[in-house]
Amino acid sequence: MFGRTYYCGEITEKAIGETVKLKGWVQKRRDLGGLIFIDLRDRSGIVQVVFNPDVSKEALAAAEAIRNEYVLDIEGTVSAREEGTVNPNLKTGKIEIKAEAVTVLSTAKTPPFPISDQAADVSEDVRLKHRYLDLRRPAMFQTLQMRHQVTKSIRHFLDENGFLDIETPILTKSSPEGARDYLVPSRVHEGEFYALPQSPQIFKQLLMVSGFERYYQVARCFRDEDLRADRQPEFTQIDIEMSFMSQEDIMALAEEMMAKVMLETKGVEVPLPLPRMTYEEAMNSYGSDKPDTRFGMLLTDVSDIVKDTEFKVFSSAVANGGVVKAINVKGAAGDYSRKDIDALGVFAGNYGAKGLAWVKVEADGVKGPIAKFFDEEKQAKLAEALEASEGDLLLFGADKFEVVAQSLGALRLKLGKERGLIDESLFNFLWVVDWPLLEHDEEEGRFYAAHHPFTMPVREDLDLIETAPEDMKAQAYDLVLNGYELGGGSIRIFEKDVQEKMFGLLGFTKEEAEEEFGYLLEAFEYGAPPHGGIALGLDRLVMLLAGRTNLRDTIAFPKTASASCLLTEAPGEVSDAQLEELHLSVKRKVKQ
């Protein structure tokens, strides 16, 4: 009886009178004394099965012992439900199956939690410990089904556009740039280690040098970094690289691909071309390099208005090269007490802010701790700059630009969510362009690559390498959706001398650069084409399209926030024999 004629959730009234064979799990069992009803579930949905002695006494007797999550093989006839028993909440709610035969394929213990999307109070640890049960829930199946549909759509688009799906190594060489590597000891080469790839970056560039011209890969990547809700130690990215393409060409292709994905998976038409915003504009107006444009409450620079005020926090910040910015929380003056605003200040402090100044706009002017520092003229200018009116709450940050932008940007997002300003039905894509090539770490006194060391500077800025590297712009572009970075790309360096200069800016000696990246530098000596690409985070994209709140829900078997697998209990200890084979010994920390 291993053949099946229908999936449970796909039987309609058209099948009334047919004899069908079904397979699935028992979602629910109800004994009404003489009749037994079972909701049979498979990946497509649920159908009601009725065990009636008038149809089959043998089937009814077998159903007496059946419990939730048993796996059944059922044969029966499709019938219309009686009037008054139709279930409008089920796709199969107008029909039922009159069971003629049933075979128990597998029994089941009582699950540790209900197999239902309504089981919201179950802890995530319990769900992850029993992930194979958690994945039976319809919402989890639908999320992974969407992941499949997204990947399928992307593969089809890239195939139609002449891209080749090429795999790159998982065991590769550790790189000094980026996050920490996951290291794999070599048994054959004593004391030496492979690294799991943080991305296929160099290999895809080498494929361009090899002449493949258009490459893609659904690539597994690994980073040993501190985790948060939208990160995992192992993740998947849609990796794309092209030769002889400009930044405009790559962005046009990537956004066309995303429009196709949105139409095929969500039925949403995305107008093209996508909007663009410079990095400087994003940081100035949104306090973020991945702005959420679904709502307003933009950051406004009021430095010129308040620079000569007697409020020293403002005047000193401007005098010392910093800024004063503000956000207008429309209509919020009556909703936030002093205690509430103090709590907002504590939140801003998590992002480096030393405090949060504020005033409330009332009919006769502004009120609040710093209101006395604003005369009528300044109040009028602030009201104009912030489009403020009676009932508004104005929040100010004063410090270095980076601190103010980051703290007010985070506060903007928090308040946008709290006040219901974000339309969750929107999918707002945009490109962030004109990135700085380098970031300067003041504590270490050195430069870091804003994206990665292989990003090509804007051609006009190449002369600044020796004189003003901090002013160089990158040929880089990030794709943002609803305040999340979906991915980033750039035109790559393909000339050996430029790449060597870039390594020098990042603190590599010529010998260190040769030792770490000599094979890439040598490849550039054999005729390298101009090339560039983009990498998009598949897990994050699916999270946003499926309306989930963390990446773990988009991955079949994810890791926890501490990078462990509760199902398999990885990572785990290994035997002394295994360590000896690898020429390793474990040095354990002494517990205090």
UniProtKB/Swiss-Prot annotation:
Pfam families xrefs: GAD (PF02938), tRNA-synt_2 (PF00152), tRNA_anti-codon (PF01336)
Coiled-coil regions listed: none
One annotated GO biological process: aspartyl-tRNA aminoacylation
EC numbers for this chain: 6.1.1.23
Site (Important for tRNA non-discrimination): 84
Chief location category: cytoplasm
Enzymatic reactions: tRNA(Asx) + L-aspartate + ATP = L-aspartyl-tRNA(Asx) + AMP + diphosphate
InterPro entries: Aa-tRNA-synt_II, aa-tRNA-synth_II, aa-tRNA-synth_II/BPL/LPL, Asp-tRNA-ligase_1, Asp-tRNA-ligase_1_N, Asp/Asn-tRNA-synth_IIb, AspRS_core, GAD-like_sf
Binding-site residues for ATP, renumbered to this chain: 223-225, 232, 485, 537-540
Aspartate: annotated segments: 201-204
Enzyme class: ligase
A molecular function GO annotation: transferase activity
Keyword tags: Aminoacyl-tRNA synthetase, ATP-binding, Cytoplasm, Ligase, Nucleotide-binding, Protein biosynthesis
Binding-site residues for L-aspartate, renumbered to this chain: 177, 223, 451, 492
Entry GO CC: cytoplasm
Localization, UniProt: Cytoplasm
Matches recorded under Gene3D superfamilies: Bira Bifunctional Protein, Domain 2, GAD-like domain, Nucleic acid-binding proteins
Subunit structure: Homodimer.
HAMAP family referenced in this protein's UniProt entry, alphabetically: Asp_tRNA_synth_type1 (MF_00044)
Family of this protein: Belongs to the class-II aminoacyl-tRNA synthetase family. Type 1 subfamily.
Biological role: Aspartyl-tRNA synthetase with relaxed tRNA specificity since it is able to aspartylate not only its cognate tRNA(Asp) but also tRNA(Asn). Reaction proceeds in two steps: L-aspartate is first activated by ATP to form Asp-AMP and then transferred to the acceptor end of tRNA(Asp/Asn).
Name of the protein: Aspartate--tRNA(Asp/Asn) ligase
Gene label: aspS
